[in-house]
Amino acid sequence: ARGDAEKWESLISEERACKGEGVKGCYDKPDDWCCKKTPCKCPAWSHERECRCTQPCARRCRGKRALMLDPETHRLLFSED
């Protein structure tokens, strides 16, 4: 896993926040979310859907791609009363 992380780091040429109003999360399967509301790192050539979370999250999720959720979908998945 460490080698993968180093490989990914070497690909990063730009760090920026993901764009849009969505809430960021890492995913493995569509119903496996974590890293919500954390900053993302993005390869310069990519759009925000190819970003990755910069902060630690659940070990099983770490290093997965960051995913943008529109606010309505986020409300459906994570009702924050």
UniProtKB/Swiss-Prot annotation:
Subcellular location: Secreted
Major localization class: secreted
Disulfide bonds, paired cysteine numbers: C18-C35, C26-C40, C34-C53, C42-C51
Gene Ontology cellular-component terms listed: extracellular region
Modified residues (Arginine amide): R62
Keyword Electron transport: no
UniProt keyword terms in alphabetical order: Amidation, Calcium channel impairing toxin, Cleavage on pair of basic residues, Disulfide bond, Ion channel impairing toxin, Knottin, Neurotoxin, Secreted, Toxin, Voltage-gated calcium channel impairing toxin, Voltage-gated sodium channel impairing toxin
Superkingdom of origin organism: Eukaryota
Single Gene Ontology MF annotation: toxin activity
Comment block on domains: The presence of a 'disulfide through disulfide knot' structurally defines this protein as a knottin.
Protein name: U1-sicaritoxin-Li1c
Species per Swiss-Prot/TrEMBL record: Loxosceles intermedia
